[in-house]
Regions:
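Pyridoxal 5′-phosphate
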Residues: 1-133
Length: 133
């Protein structure tokens, strides 16, 4: 049996019970909203596209298509220059990317969770602006 996995799962469930799902979701929603607000400012300059519905309940995940740069290059620069670890590609959803018209380059996916801080969101937005300028 996977004893470390079982123990980790127990501790994760304990954390969720003690913290509360609503508290975790509220924090994640706050980060998600701040990130989208910052992206809308950049999006207004036609530098990025946010495929999908932004208004729905979220899981803390935002996918972006960079219109003026290769998505893989943006992902690499965020990691190498700023230490921001994200993922680029089709994210195991090629049919969804066909619907969004991003099947050739995929998107850059950002995900936020309970242990992320607002400062990290602001630093990420600043890094995106610097890369695109």
């Amino acid at each position: 049996p996977n004893i470390p996995g079982i123990y980790g799962l127990e501790k994760a469930l304990q954390f969720i019970e003690e913290t509360g799902v609503k508290e975790i979701q509220a924090h994640t929603n706050m980060l998600h909203q701040r990130f989208l607000e910052g992206l809308y400012e950049i999006q207004g300059k036609n530098l990025i596209r946010i495929p999908g519905k932004e208004g729905r309940e979220n899981s803390g995940v935002v996918s972006i298509d960079f219109c003026t740069m290769d998505n893989a290059l943006v992902c690499n620069r965020l990691a190498s220059r700023y230490g921001i670890m994200i993922r680029q590609g089709l994210h195991c959803a090629p049919i969804a990317h066909q619907c969004f018209g991003t099947e050739k380059s995929g998107t850059v996916r950002f995900s936020f969770g309970f242990f992320n801080r607002m400062e990290e969101i602001d630093r990420t937005l600043l890094a995106i602006q610097e890369i695109l300028s």
